[in-house]
Amino acid sequence: MPELALLEEVVEKVRPLLGQGKVANYIPALASVDAGKLGIAVTTVDGETLGAGDYLEPFSIQSISKVFSLTLALTLYEEAEIWSRVGKEPSGHSFNSLVQVELERGKPRNPFINAGALVIADLLQSRLGAPKHRMLELVRQLSQNDKVCFDKQVADSEYQHSARNAAIAYLMKSFGNFQGDVDTVLRTYFHYCALKMNCADLSRAMLYLANRGKTVDGTELISQVQTRQLNALLATSGLYDGAGEFAYRVGMPGKSGVGGGIIAVIPGELSICVWSPELDENGNSLAGTAMLEHLSQRLGRSIF
């Protein structure tokens, strides 16, 4: 377990970077977030959580939710049913690209770009009676925090600016790779993105990725093999177009969101969440990436 002094050092080390990135502004409800926030939390495979900075302040998890939705799909579907509809390759295009959907005849490159996450949401919508409620149930169980909730203002804000995601969904539907009602699935998807959690919640919730599929309370959520495969996808496709840079600098499987959060995993040891709302040109937290880089160097850890 890293000591508290190390986590505090990591936070202070990156503080000079504040002001160099930009807060996401294409979702009005996210644009008003205090740009000066910095937080980090780690949870060990023994279930102990430690944090520094603004680690208890909730934020919008955005695309980090795509890890939860894929995990939920893995518990409900045969793997062939999932991977026949979404690929496992890095994208190389922007996370909300229509061009790629057209070129690949409606099959998204991976589950962590918008097109792929919409297919996963479509799968969940078709198999669950109440997909929003089931997701809330899952993340509350994983984080051991019953107060985790959806931010309705953020969900509504995203829905009001959903033309591009709707276009992606309809394009996939034209290729036969989208089954449900587009509007209904979009609302579910935006609720997932609008989950509000803090660094401590997320580091606990993601422990199964570091712990062979087992959650904080020891329950097996997904198999050991599925966990390894999910971490492989996170290592190659979890950071938008910055996955290579992140692998080079940090050396851990990870997933970012435009709310400024990044989760990362040291398999067999730790799950980590960092938060700083200012983003780099790839849409990843600028200071958050630097925190993870410094932590990995100080711990001497990398999956490579």
From Swiss-Prot:
Enzyme Commission number(s) from the entry: 3.5.1.2
InterPro entries xrefs: Beta-lactam/transpept-like, Glutaminase
Binding residues annotated for substrate, in chain numbering: S63, N114, E158, N165, Y189, Y240, V258
Gene Ontology terms for molecular function: glutaminase activity
Broadest EC class assigned to this enzyme: hydrolase
GO terms classed as biological process: glutamate biosynthetic process; glutamine catabolic process
Keyword DNA-binding in record: no
Residues spanning the signal sequence: none
Entry annotated with the keyword Hydrolase: yes
Annotated TM spans: none
Keywords associated with the record: Hydrolase
Record text on subunit structure and interactions: Homotetramer.
Family (UniProt): Belongs to the glutaminase family.
Protein name per Swiss-Prot or TrEMBL: Glutaminase
Protein species of origin: Shewanella sp. (strain W3-18-1)
